[in-house]
């Protein structure tokens, strides 16, 4: 077992049923979700300057724009039509369609509102190497692991609404360069994330029928929390500690 993602909650015994699995998943979120990361505390508490917020939004774009790619890979793993139909709306949520904008367009409203050129953002040429490695690892995970683990890795959405609420309130309160219009991505996700999380949780509780499968589900969630945490580690190292790697975005005045 990979020590980086090994499931261990206080030396607990193997998970015996679906209810124990859900409790373990929620415990993982309480201990490992990236709302706890110091960078988020700085971001939501108004402790960053505009250039640091720009760097966060720029790097996070790569994650946001990769989500529909990840979800297309998840869909490709299932012969079951009902699961594909249920998962398909996630792609539409982020990509949008001919008549409505999606999450990626809303994220570009954020980066534009922060003063970044959309062409530069979409090129991803200024993102941190660790951002690219972490996000690509997530896409590869859903491609290479079991379909059950692929769905389980999305369960960070269980914990996202509280983070979005904290982000909306904190950033609007503390930054004069932030307004409600450019925060529309997070407001929309307050509706979408619970729906997505409910389906994923029902799926893993139904289909993880052995202790080994329940452990694999927990490890998938731990892996995903590591993906999110690693991105913030890199942002903190580069833009708070001041160690920006060659080729990465350098905010004005840095």
Curated annotation (Swiss-Prot):
Pathway: Cofactor biosynthesis; pyrroloquinoline quinone biosynthesis. Keywords: Oxidoreductase, PQQ biosynthesis. Belongs to the PqqC family. GO terms for biological process: pyrroloquinoline quinone biosynthetic process; sulfur compound metabolic process. Gene3D superfamilies: Heme oxygenase-like. This is Pyrroloquinoline-quinone synthase. Its EC number is 1.3.3.11. GO terms for molecular function: pyrroloquinoline-quinone synthase activity.
């Amino acid at each position: 077992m990979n020590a980086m993602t090994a499931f261990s909650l206080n030396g607990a015994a193997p998970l015996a049923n679906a209810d124990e699995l859900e409790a373990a998943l929620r415990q993982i979120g309480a201990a490992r979700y990236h709302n706890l990361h110091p960078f988020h505390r700085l971001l939501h508490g108004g402790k960053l300057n505009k250039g640091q917020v720009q760097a966060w939004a720029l790097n996070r774009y790569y994650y946001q724009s990769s989500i529909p790619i990840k979800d297309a890979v998840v869909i490709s793993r299932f012969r079951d039509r009902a699961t594909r139909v249920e998962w398909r709306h996630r792609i539409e949520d982020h990509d949008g369609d001919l008549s409505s904008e999606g999450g990626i367009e809303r994220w570009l409203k954020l980066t534009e509102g922060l003063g970044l050129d959309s062409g530069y953002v979409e090129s991803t040429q200024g993102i941190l190497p660790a951002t690219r490695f972490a996000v690509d690892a997530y896409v590869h995970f859903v491609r290479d692991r079991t379909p059950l683990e692929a769905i389980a890795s999305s369960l960070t959405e269980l914990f996202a609404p509280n983070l979005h609420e904290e982000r909306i309130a904190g950033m609007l309160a503390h930054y004069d360069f932030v307004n409600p219009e450019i925060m529309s991505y997070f407001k929309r996700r307050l509706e979408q994330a619970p729906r997505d999380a409910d389906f994923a949780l029902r799926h893993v509780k139904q289909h993880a029928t052995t202790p080994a499968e329940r452990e694999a589900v927990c490890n998938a969630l731990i892996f995903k929390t590591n993906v999110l945490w690693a991105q913030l580690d890199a942002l903190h190292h580069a833009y708070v500690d001041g160690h920006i790697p060659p080729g990465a975005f350098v905010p004005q005045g840095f």
